[in-house]
Amino acid sequence: MNLEVKKIDTANARLSAKPSIEDLEKRYDKIAQKIAQKVKIDGFRRGKVPLSLVKTRYQAQIEQDAQEEMIQEVLKNALKELGVETKDLIGSPNFTKFEKKDTHFEIEADIGLKPTIVLDKIQECVPSVGVEVPNEEKVNERLKQLAKDYAKFVDTDSQRKAQNDDKLTIDFEGFIDNAPFEGGKAENFSLILGSKQMLEDFEKALLGMQASEEKEFPLTFPSGYHAEHLAGKEALFKVKLRQIQVREALEINDELAKIVLANEENATLELLKERVKGQLFLENKARLYNEELKEKLIENLDEKILFDLPKTIIEQEMDLLFRNALYSMQAEEVKSLQDSQEKAKEKRESFRNDATKSVKITFVIDALAKEEKIGVHDNEVFQTLYYEAMMTGQNPENLIEQYRKNNMLAAVKMAMIEDRVLAYLLDKNLPKEQQEILEKMRPNAQKTQVG
């Protein structure tokens, strides 16, 4: 076999090979024998089909399998010549030429190799971090909210008029064009007035009502209402208010702490204040990281961590970004790209910078995760998707299966690993006193979240 291999840089190589037709044909018998052991042809026992018949009936498959074997051997020899192990091959080779001549094939391909990444400048990439530590006023605000959230609802004076934050029990039925509609009726339905559990105009109409009072009022469903058969429709609602309950105020003291920190043996108000302060600090930290510092850190990693990137992976990422962009394009723009190969190439090329950055950051994050032993368990991926499903009203099992079918679980895991790696680097750059706050919160993270 005539083989030439050239290493372009530490992450890219190019091969040129001219395997003979004779080399290909030598593989036919062996492949045909494998097929003969599996196929069943009328008139012959399994495994007893003549090779000549197998070669005739399965000629296309034999040719394809032989070519794949030949390509794998070319690739194996190329890696050997480069002194590279198979595990260091990144992605699939990009075959730029594959032509069958009279006596041989002409094959040319670009090969992506695992890049060499030096992480000695990582600390230079991490921006200075200073998270706002919540003051006493912020802590007291959260304590008041906790006292409200944990308060029980109790019956009240029958003459009370419904106010925001009251718990109402109602019967209601809605009509469109004098006819009841699906989902428009309920009995003994509970809601917190002002919570936006129902449409705002519906809740406003209940303000000022008293127990046992009945009321009719018109309501127009928003044009973007989630139930399409109701969107933009005018309805008439009949409502009966059965009961009004109000929150029984809780004092901010040790008793509140025992309710909120139910898993703690000796919960006190001071401990609750400490936990609230820590929780508020974590919220401030997450907001600062997500809205500002993580993106700044990514930009610094992209700018300062320099290494060769496998071009085959960049091209694959460009294809992915281009395909994803097609889904959000107007039909006219998609047709314009379909009608003009030049425009399609230009549009695809516009994703090169984003693709290069994405590939680079993925390699850096992967290297950092391995160095710092940061990972994500499969169960954590499923928990994240389960939470997403619950928040969007989807069936968790269906959502997970959808991600699995579309081979997206690995992407979710990688995104979670990236988030942890970036947070880890930023946490290390926190002032000492703020790192101490983090350390105090970690043992309690799984116990109780306050607020």
Curated annotation (Swiss-Prot):
Catalysed reaction, written as an equation: [protein]-peptidylproline (omega=180) = [protein]-peptidylproline (omega=0)
Gene3D superfamilies annotated for this entry?
Answer: 3.10.50.40, Trigger factor ribosome-binding domain (3.30.70.1050), Trigger factor, C-terminal domain (1.10.3120.10)
Q: What is its EC number?
A: 5.2.1.8
Localization per Swiss-Prot or TrEMBL: Cytoplasm
Keyword annotations for this protein, in alphabetical order, are: Cell cycle, Cell division, Chaperone, Cytoplasm, Isomerase, Rotamase
Q: Name one GO molecular function term.
A: protein folding chaperone
The similarity comment for this entry is: Belongs to the FKBP-type PPIase family. Tig subfamily.
Query: What PANTHER family has UniProt attached to this entry?
Result: TRIGGER FACTOR CHAPERONE AND PEPTIDYL-PROLYL CIS/TRANS ISOMERASE, TRIGGER FACTOR-LIKE PROTEIN TIG, CHLOROPLASTIC
Q: Which GO terms describe its cellular component?
A: cytoplasm
Q: Which residues form a coiled coil?
A: none
Summarizing the function annotation, the protein's role is: Involved in protein export. Acts as a chaperone by maintaining the newly synthesized protein in an open conformation. Functions as a peptidyl-prolyl cis-trans isomerase.
What's the protein called, per UniProt? Trigger factor
**Cited Pfam families:** FKBP_C, Trigger_C, Trigger_N
In terms of InterPro entries, this protein maps to:
PPIase_dom_sf, PPIase_FKBP_dom, Trig_fac, Trigger_fac_C, Trigger_fac_C_sf, Trigger_fac_ribosome-bd_bac, Trigger_fac_ribosome-bd_sf, Trigger_fact/SurA_dom_sf
| Ranges for domain PPIase FKBP-type | 165-250
GO BP: any one term: protein transport
Supply the domain comment.
Consists of 3 domains; the N-terminus binds the ribosome, the middle domain has PPIase activity, while the C-terminus has intrinsic chaperone activity on its own.
